[in-house]
Amino acid sequence: MLVIQSFRWDDKNYLELNSDIRKELRKNRVNADIRTFYLDCECYMAEEEEERMYNFIDTIRLWKPDLILVNDDQATYTLMKCGHPFVKKVPVVFSGVNFPNWDLLEKYPNVTGSWDKIDYKENLRLIDQQMGKSRIYINYDKTSLGQLAFRELIKAVDTSRYVLNYNQLAFQLNDPDFKVDSMTFRTEMRMKAIRPSKNVIHFMPFRKANGEFLLSNINGTYPYCVFFNIRYDYTSAGLSKMFVTPSFTAVREIFNINVEVLGGYFCSNRIQAAEQARLAAKILSGTPVSSVPIVESPKEYLYDWGEMQRLGISKEEVPTNVHIINMPISELGFLSPLPWA
């Protein structure tokens, strides 16, 4: 069995994900010789990336894996886009894909998987429930996946309860799509020290920001601010690590990798691996891929205990539907001393 991962081999997320994939395959009684290829997508332009994938697929034709497991948007898209004829000859199960390319998928009847549709609305509700009315900072970028994430987020926002603030895009990027007058901008700066009456979503061009702008917005100068990660790329972990204020995430990749992310509502590594292994086992047992429809991945609410400690959040302050990981045994609360201890 071939596993294709989108990012570098040393991506912190893969230590857990690769282990979970093996565990879940064993649970489904799939005893597989697993080989893993890391696309390292952040280091290549689109054409180079497709060529890299094509050349790699060329090397496995003689090995002929029974099935390919491919993870996340970049590797899934590039596997189909590279155009290697072998890709159409072997069953493929994708997982962790936030923005499926449906047009491309129609050309590959041998490809199925689980769609990790990001639930922005539920994550915003969680932030409001945990933090109260806040200024929610979101990294804005004009990459293809960045624009998809931006559009999906906008669709999910209830504008009767949230204010969408594009001011920094107008001033920092001189972006003609976003206009604001300087008086509005100055008023906003004066109001930053006051808790807003509505949640305010600030779209921040952190990729293009100068040092002064970046530092003034991440160092905790202004209260009632949180960082919300809406998708994953090479900037996500670094930004979350730099923010002094609480960080939430709508995707699994930067959770539980020691970059100071409190948590969120998303499809965890455990769920992703379980879904992928379940679909793989079904296909390997003889079910045609055409009879295995693409499904939407389940999600769960997760917080990291260590980050709760850093932020001074007690167990009693956490919503009851949130599962806390990395909690020491002494804090679990259900263990009582043995009668003979």
Language-model segment annotations:
Residues L2-A341:
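Short hydrophobic alpha-helices and adjacent helix-cap/hinge residues
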